[in-house]
Structure formats: structure tokens, C-alpha cells
Design a protein with these regions (language model features):
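Catalytic core of non-heme Fe(II) oxygenases with the double-stranded beta-helix
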Residues: 32-149
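Non-heme Fe(II)/2-oxoglutarate
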Residues: 1-41, 46, 142, 146-182
Length: 182
């Protein structure tokens, strides 16, 4: 029988504390992340590197990513791209619509519900570096999905400068956040 390798990358859990603290702070203080995810816990866990030929096959993250997580269950995963010095290595997410390929660039972060299967395509040249972690949410995935659409409605209303829509969607968004996070 042929050996099946789920992944071919290098991972390190030895994340410098200052990097973890800075990234956690940036995530907590991002208005969009707060509006959509409403994070209650952010866990910055791994630095990973995919050299030429590196990949991560399709998988689903565990709700409880670590045995010593003190019964913290995670709702979202994220990957933060650290470089542009590679070809291939795209992040692939499978949702209700199908597979979506994200060729992340340096500084881009992708946050996704951990219930979605995902993978990293094979790196064809160079080295892909990223930081990955997980978040718990104060609201359920379904509630967060609704908040995302209300947030987008609010953003669209602001673009159209329709004051009545801005106020209405802001009120609904704030009500939902308050209702679901208590």
C-alpha cells in the first residue's frame, strides 16, 4: 500500500510571545473581525513553512485544537501570509459554493469557519511562510453569518450615503451583537 501523507511542511509551536501578543491584539482590535467573528478567544499557535513540494491535503480542523486548551472550543481558523517569495501554495477553502482558491499575499489574513474543509496547494517554487491560529466566537456560526451580511449591508449603505439605511442597519447590527454575545 502507498503511504498517505496529510501534509508536507515544517511547523513550529515556538511562536515568540511578542509576535503572538501583537497579532492577537491586532485581531481583537480589528473592527471587521469584531463585527463578524466577535472573538472571545484568539490562539496564535503555529509558524509554518512550505518549501518547494510542500502541501497540506484537504482536512477539517478540530473544534478543540489542543488537548490542554482548558475546554476552549474554536469556531474559526486563520492563516496569515508572511511572504511573497513563492509560487503555488494557494490556500483552498471548500464551502457551500464549492472550492475557492486564495493566492494569499504578504500581510493578508484569511479567517474561515473551521467546519469548512481546506488545504494548501503544492508549492512549486520558493518558500511559503505563514502564521496559523484559531478563534472562539461569542456567537454561533449561523449568527455570525447573519452578522456578516448585516455588516456588508451597512458598508453598502455607507457607500450610497443613504442615512436612513446606515442608521437602520447599524441598529440591527448592534442589536444582534448584543443579543448573541450575552
Amino acid at each position: 500500500t502507498e503511504k498517505y501523507d496529510l501534509k508536507n511542511n515544517t511547523e513550529s509551536r515556538k511562536m515568540p510571545q511578542e509576535v503572538s501578543t501583537l497579532l492577537t491584539s491586532k485581531i481583537y482590535n480589528n473592527h471587521y473581525v469584531d463585527s463578524v467573528v466577535c472573538p472571545s478567544k484568539v490562539s496564535v499557535n503555529f509558524y509554518n513553512e512550505y518549501t518547494e513540494g510542500g502541501y497540506y491535503r484537504k482536512h477539517v480542523d478540530s473544534f478543540k485544537a489542543f488537548p490542554k486548551a482548558n475546554n476552549v472550543f474554536f469556531d474559526y481558523g486563520f492563516t496569515l501570509c508572511l511572504d511573497d517569495e513563492h509560487e503555488g501554495g494557494e490556500f483552498v477553502l471548500e464551502n457551500e459554493v464549492g472550492e475557492i482558491v486564495y493566492p494569499l499575499k504578504r500581510g493578508q489574513i484569511l479567517i474561515f469557519p473551521i467546519i469548512y474543509p481546506h488545504s494548501v496547494n503544492k508549492v512549486t517554487s520558493g518558500s511559503r511562510k505563514a502564521i496559523v491560529g484559531w478563534m472562539s466566537s461569542n456567537v454561533s456560526y449561523e449568527q455570525s453569518y447573519i452578522l456578516k451580511h448585516v455588516y456588508q449591508l451597512n458598508a453598502d449603505a455607507i457607500k450610497s450615503l443613504n442615512e436612513e439605511m446606515i442608521v437602520k442597519s447599524g441598529v440591527v447590527q448592534n442589536y444582534l451583537i448584543k443579543h448573541w454575545s450575552t
